[in-house]
């Protein structure tokens, strides 16, 4: 899994891959801002397997912390709804 992550970072550097953050939708063009987030955090029983990983920008990954992907998306959706009202 680590080898695949390094390969993805290399493709970002070369401009051949521009992943989107799963959470905020931001295009990740800087390899230093690219992370693979655990949808179910390791601290909550998640594993480092492809089915439990998703691209995320550094900000979202750090802010998400120990939340699951679904929990963090609920937080983001709540914030968006509060901004509209």
Q: In which residue ranges do the predicted regions lie?
A:
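Short, cysteine/histidine-rich loop/knuckle motifs that typically chelate Zn2+
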Residues: 23-24, 59
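Short, charged surface segments at domain edges that flank catalytic/cofactor-binding sites
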Residues: 1-23
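Cys/His-enriched microdomains
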Residues: 19, 34, 55
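Short beta-strand-alpha-helix junction that forms the catalytic/metal-binding core
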Residues: 44-63
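Short, non-ligating residues that shape and space the ligands of small metal-coordination modules
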Residues: 30-31, 63-67
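A boundary/linker detector
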Residues: 1-8, 27, 76-85
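Histidine-centered catalytic micro-motifs used for acid/base chemistry in nuclease
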Residues: 35-41
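Flanking scaffold residues of small Cys/His-coordinated metal-binding clusters
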Residues: 15-16, 31, 48-52
